[in-house]
A protein has these predicted regions:
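Hydrophobic faces of well-ordered beta-strands that scaffold small-molecule active sites
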Residues: 3-9, 22-27, 47-55, 83-85, ...
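Glycan-binding loop/region signatures in secreted carbohydrate-active enzymes
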Residues: 147-209, 242
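Extracellular low-complexity, Gly/Ser/Thr-rich intrinsically disordered linkers
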Residues: 193-232
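Substrate-binding surface in catalytic domains of secreted glycosidases
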Residues: 80, 86-174
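A structural motif corresponding to the C-terminal end of an alpha-helix
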Residues: 45-47, 77-80, 104-107, 137-144, ...
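An active-site-proximal structural segment forming one wall of the substrate-binding cleft
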Residues: 62-83, 101
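Glycan-recognition patch characteristic of GH18 chitinases/ENGases
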Residues: 1-70
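Aromatic-rich peripheral "rim/lid" segments of glycoside hydrolase catalytic domains that contact
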Residues: 227-246
Length: 246
């Protein structure tokens, strides 16, 4: 593969899988509710994995230097290929101080857009919306390294004389006979008297094409949920093995 897909796992999924041989994104590390550092730092990970920190527990009196030191030690001991700061609470000054401290570490760091502006580390972007062209989506970050979250997705866009609206996707199993090479999705069109519905779907095949195309924008790290993309990852490994053997 010309890209790396990390499968994001919870602590329970990692324990159940029993030492996966592929690099993962460990997404169970968070701010301690009882101290000033981090909780749930794993004892072992597959080499080359990403250590992820979320802010589901709000920042209180947490120590940026302590957290940076914990992550530095963990990344070294676990042979991680990088750290992801998956911070979703916007505008937290104390969270920004933690991000600033972690981004000074001698490891690749990816951070969500809310806290990426003041740092020169990679930006960790959410999945591309189905109706958005990738190049336009990446444009605000063209001078930055980008790590991209990927997901199987589907939606419906209804067009009326009054404008557009996004609706839930159509029933699973219905066909998507058309392909859009610009949006990396498949679609169907339902024309009615008062509206036109565009049903969009990004399945595993579209995801693979998207990730391969993203390399031309310098994007080579992708993250997807293990519970959703685990079988897809196995297919990618099988394709690589077949190419190598041939």
């Amino acid at each position: 593969m010309s890209f790396v897909l990390y499968l994001a796992m919870t602590a329970a999924e990692l324990q159940h899988h029993s030492a996966p041989s592929f690099p993962i994104g460990f997404m169970a590390c968070h701010f301690s509710p009882y101290g000033t550092g981090l909780s749930n730092i794993p004892h072992t990970l597959p080499p080359g994995s990403l250590l992820m920190v979320n802010d589901r527990t709000p920042v209180n009196n947490h120590d940026p230097d302590l957290i940076a030191a914990q992550l530095c030690d963990a990344a070294q001991c676990l042979e991680c290929s990088g750290i992801v700061l998956d911070f979703q609470r916007p505008g937290e000054e104390r969270t920004q101080k933690i991000a600033d401290a972690v981004c000074q570490l001698p490891f690749p760091v990816g951070i969500t857009p809310q806290y990426a502006g003041k740092n020169r580390c990679a930006v960790f972007l959410p999945p591309i919306e189905l109706a958005m062209e990738p190049e336009k989506y990446f444009a605000p970050w063209r001078d930055r390294e980008i790590w991209l979250e990927t997901v199987r997705d589907s939606t419906c866009i209804r067009i009326t004389k009054d404008g557009n609206q996004q609706l839930p996707p159509m029933e699973e199993g219905l066909p998507y006979p058309h392909t859009d090479r610009e949006l990396f999705c498949r679609y169907s069109i339902d024309v009615q008297n008062q509206h036109i519905d565009f049903h969009l779907c990004r399945d595993e095949g579209c995801l693979q094409e998207l990730m391969e195309a993203c390399t031309k924008w310098g994007i080579s790290r992708f993250m997807g949920l293990y519970q959703q993309l685990g079988p897809f990852y196995s297919q990618l490994l099988a394709q690589d093995t077949a190419r190598f053997q041939s």
